[in-house]
């Protein structure tokens, strides 16, 4: 009788061994549900951003400040998220993926629950800063977790990471679907933002629980901090891979200790000769898309209120429809065609089409309200299908695991400057120039287009994880 033998176990003695295993093997369960759970912090980020954008004018009235100052206070979450993104790598390296997920979403939950009962504008400011730190920490975690689940060289990894853009618009649509029943149930219009933000805090708690159960710890992190037995357990449970710990050589032990002392670094490497162009491309794509979105997408309900009849109910219904038809659909189509076009070309085409749509809107906005609505929908669609999610996708797929959270956190931090610019400066520009402001806004996607033309880097399918040993060696210097 023949005996069935199990496959030979992998032997691991250094972090690169675990990285290579994860790179070659997708997790056993990488369903769309698991991907969305990993991207859960982005859902909360989108939800709270849209909710506070909706509540901006009500916050100004309730606390006796100007709409411009209210927008500045609300934008404090972006400044805090910028700082949180820069600190994300330290938090992840210190606490690991599992606890860092709890820290990020925990801060967001506390801030959201507290801002819902804010008695004054200073309370709002402090709570928004707390939320921002949490969201800034969470984003690099989320995209890094998806990359680990899929394996960085898998053809599905780019599409999975880029699903965060579709997730963003799903969450934004949920905002309006939450506000509508609250409004119809008799909640005072000026109190809607408080109820909506509190509902967001409940969503954040649910995301925390789901992540704790279904995502867990990172095998790569466990290996980097020397917990090889734990890494073997994670590989067995999540990837169905059998691995055993081999005794490291003395030189590997010394190298590991040196790397651990230097592990908090990494920002300098983002601009060395190998990674400079990758960093610039990811940051510019991310920043320009954030600028154009926060100028158009965040103020969509206010724009539609001037186009459609039906008051606030009509504006909320129209916003939900535009986000669902154009944003969600665009994000889904963008993920499906990503393998064919690649991140750079898809970003380039998206920026070009948004530029054309903005120029058309500047020329034709006053001719027909429904034409304006169609052009706004086109901007949302081409943004979502094109560069909307690809700045972060480029950042996630351009760096090996040791500096991946650093690269994503840095790109996300720089991206926040574009979001702040769109959120604060667009209303000022609109107040002075009205529809002619669209001409000036078209400069933003055009700069993104030029960057994609000039920098020829395509991370999709590149085996960047193989560069991890070299990065660790550079960190030791």
How would you describe each model-predicted region?
Residues 2-477:
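Transmembrane-helix signature of 12-pass secondary carriers
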